[in-house]
Amino acid sequence: MKVAANSSKMLAEKLELMKGGRRRRRRSRRRRRRSRRRSRSPYRRRYRRRRRRRRRRSRRRRYRRRRSYSRRRYRRRR
């Protein structure tokens, strides 16, 4: 009987951990929101600008006619 009782308790604890218990959920959500706000504003904007400049320079040298089409498509997507 003891073994069965322990196994049921272990299963209940595992389910709570998988669901992410109330305490853990609140902490994780707050941390994620803060980290996303901080990372989006300074880091991602600089990174995207650098990437676009590099791609435009490389495409000007290789494909002069296709450049206009690629720029229009990028603006529509992003």
Curated annotation (Swiss-Prot):
Report whether Phosphoprotein shows up as a keyword of the record: yes
Q: List GO BP terms, alphabetically.
A: cell differentiation; chromosome condensation; spermatogenesis
Keyword Phosphoprotein on entry: yes
State the coiled-coil residue ranges.
none
Where does this protein have compositionally biased stretches of type Basic residues?
Answer: 20-78
Its primary localisation, in coarse terms, equals nucleus
Where's it found, cell-wise? Nucleus; Chromosome
Post-translationally, this protein is described as follows, namely: Phosphorylation occurs at different degrees. The triphosphorylated form may be predominant in T1. SP1 appears to be phosphorylated in elongated spermatids, but dephosphorylated in mature sperm cells.
| Organism superkingdom | Eukaryota
Q: Which UniProt keywords apply?
A: Chromosome, Developmental protein, Differentiation, DNA condensation, DNA-binding, Nucleosome core, Nucleus, Phosphoprotein, Spermatogenesis
Chain intervals for the UniProt region annotation (Hydrophobic): 1-21
Task: Locate the region Disordered.
Answer: 1-78
Q: In which tissues is it expressed?
A: Testis.
Q: A GO molecular function for this record?
A: DNA binding
> What's this chain's function?
Cuttlefish spermiogenesis is characterized by a double nuclear protein transition: histones -> spermatid-specific proteins (T1/T2) -> protamines (SP1/SP2). The protamines compact sperm DNA into a highly condensed, stable and inactive complex.
Protein name, UniProt field: Spermatid-specific protein T1
